[in-house]
Amino acid sequence: LKNRLNLLKIISIILLYTFFATGCTENENNKKKPKEYTHFYPSERITSDIDRHETVYVPVYSHVYTSDEKYELMGITLSVRNTDFKQNMWIKKISYYSTQGELLESYVSKSHELNPMASIDFVVDLNDIRGGSGANFIVEWEGSKTLSNPIIQAVMVNNSGNKAFSFITNGENLK
């Protein structure tokens, strides 16, 4: 009987250790992958074809209200997509502003070239609530007048717990 109790204790300890050890490991899908971009790079514009300069406003939400005092946090991904098959575009600046209009981050502060049909994304983590419910990105880009219009949008996501929220906002050209 004593041997059985000792064996049960050992098995219980092994099971508890296994339970806690596997519960504390990071999910492979949630690990951040290093970004290696060969399609988006700093560039001094050598071409004289640049005759189009645009500024795009993209509304985003670091949280959305579910009632007067309750809100859900949102992870934000800004996506800039060059939809032209042949021409590069240049991203001059990408800035992230709070509800109060305070500059929070400068994701791009000098000209970067984006290859044809390429995309680039910038992420604001789920727990970063500095932006608020009225946050926004300003994207300044340039290219040739014949360049296809890029698609610039943001995706907000929260899938924690038993609820999931996801929606997209489109960028609007400023005059």
Q: Predicted segments — roles?
A:
Residues 2-11:
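Bacterial N-terminal signal peptides that target proteins for export
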Residues 20-23:
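C-terminal motif of bacterial Sec signal peptides marking the signal peptidase cleavage site
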Residues 70-77, 135:
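Short, solvent-exposed loop/turn segments enriched in Ser/Thr/Gly
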Residues 80-87:
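Asparagine-centered strand-capping/turn motif at beta-strand->loop junctions
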Residues 87-94, 105-106, 149-152:
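Short, hydrophobic/aromatic beta-strand segments
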Residues 99-136:
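Intrinsically disordered, low-complexity Pro/Gly/Ser/Thr-rich segments with frequent PxxP/GP/PP motifs
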